[in-house]
């Protein structure tokens, strides 16, 4: 059984007719079953929502997020990313995973991208060498934030020195675990 295949249980739930219509409609739009859609919704709750509620996360429209980023000076943004990165990541990772190491750090990055919409992430590794690529739609300043945030976290948590390549929509970082 692969890591992605998990043992399932049959659970019956009672929902309103209105909610059923909404789920049917959305499942059809996404070309999936209502069962798969509900499983996805519950997965997001289990992996993201129930934790982020405790940390005061908020959801804002992408246009507003981009506009706020544009108002911030690049140096101030970099300083802020470095200042909050380790404390925030350690606090959340400790709460979610009960420990902080390379594995939980990568899980945190993946979940933050998947549910927090930080970007689309790809993580590759060959032995001790890691390459992490984040594709996003938030512009150059988000790439700056991600670079300074991940640089500080990886140097502190993994004790590795990452190398970066950034564009307005991509951050790629490479590092070797000591």
Model-predicted regions and their roles:
Residues 1-17, 27:
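Short Lys/Arg-rich basic patches
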Residues 13, 28, 136, 140:
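Short, charged/polar micro-motifs that form catalytic or ligand-binding hotspots
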């Amino acid at each position: 059984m692969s890591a992605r295949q998990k043992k399932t249980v049959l659970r019956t739930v009672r929902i309103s007719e209105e909610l059923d219509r909404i789920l049917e409609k959305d499942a059809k739009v996404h070309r999936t079953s209502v069962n798969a859609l509900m499983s996805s919704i519950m997965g997001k709750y289990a992996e993201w929502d129930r934790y982020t509620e405790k940390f005061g996360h908020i959801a804002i429209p992408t246009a507003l997020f981009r506009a706020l980023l544009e108002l911030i000076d690049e140096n101030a943004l970099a300083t802020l990313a470095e200042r909050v990165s380790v404390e925030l990541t350690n606090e959340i990772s400790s709460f979610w995973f009960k420990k902080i190491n390379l594995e939980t750090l990568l899980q945190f990055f993946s979940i933050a991208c998947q549910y927090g919409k930080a970007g689309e992430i790809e993580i590759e590794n060959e032995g001790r060498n890691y390459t992490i690529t984040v594709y996003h739609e938030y512009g150059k300043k988000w790439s700056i934030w991600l670079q300074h945030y991940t640089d500080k976290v990886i140097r502190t948590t993994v004790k590795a020195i990452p190398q970066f390549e950034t564009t307005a929509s991509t951050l790629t970082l490479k590092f070797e675990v000591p």
